[in-house]
């Protein structure tokens, strides 16, 4: 159990100058919108990109488990185990968004991510995996599962969420992280420059 204050330059919200698990439960997500990444554009974590609320802390928990079939299908290659990371994003003590991420255990070893340091794990998931030579694919759908998925906290009194499903890939197109990010609909904002 870990709580960290995010880097100030990465926070998002009205005051800022910067613009589910595979448990087998039914997925009520519909109306997908795809957002392909452009290699010329810097990418950042969707919670910081799309949540209008200014964030002041992140709580993290993780576990290591054997992968389910759906997780293996997402990675498109075999992995002996996955690191499953839950993150709750807070504003003034209230949880306003939630992310669930899956990483192959081999990646943790290859990149020397110290799992004894939740700070190092959080830094990788929030910032390092979005480095300029990496890219991602994102699909945004409406969901009613945000409060259920966030387990420990209620994100919103409404059951309306925008779910961003994301695969972050390295320069060789290997999937590094598969994530689901839940933001209450009333706090979600997507800006596109075309």
Roles of regions detected by a PLM:
Residues 55-61, 85, 91-101, 183:
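A short glycine-rich, His/Asp/Glu-containing loop-to-beta-strand
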Residues 31-35, 42, 90, 163, ...:
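A generic signature of intrinsically disordered, low-complexity regions enriched in glycine/proline
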Residues 70, 76-81, 91-94, 103-194:
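C-terminal regulatory/effector modules of DNA-binding transcriptional regulators
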């Amino acid at each position: 159990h870990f709580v960290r204050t995010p880097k100030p330059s990465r926070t998002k919200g009205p005051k800022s100058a910067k613009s589910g698990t595979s448990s087998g439960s039914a997925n009520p997500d519909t109306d997908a919108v795809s957002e392909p990444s452009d290699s010329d554009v810097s990418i950042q974590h969707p919670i910081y990109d799309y949540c209008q609320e200014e964030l002041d802390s992140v709580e993290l928990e993780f576990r290591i488990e054997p992968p389910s079939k759906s997780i293996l299908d997402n990675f498109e290659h075999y992995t002996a185990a996955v690191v499953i990371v839950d993150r709750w994003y807070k504003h003034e003590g209230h949880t306003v968004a939630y992310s669930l991420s899956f990483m192959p255990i081999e990646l943790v070893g290859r990149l020397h991510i110290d799992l004894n340091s939740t700070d190092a794990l959080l830094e990788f998931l929030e910032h390092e995996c979005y480095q300029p030579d990496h890219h991602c694919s994102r699909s945004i759908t409406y969901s009613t599962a945000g409060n259920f998925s966030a387990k420990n906290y209620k994100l919103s009194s409404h059951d309306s969420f925008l779910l961003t499903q994301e695969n972050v890939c390295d320069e060789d197109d290997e999937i590094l992280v598969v994530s689901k990010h839940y933001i209450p609909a009333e706090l979600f904002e997507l800006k596109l420059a075309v």
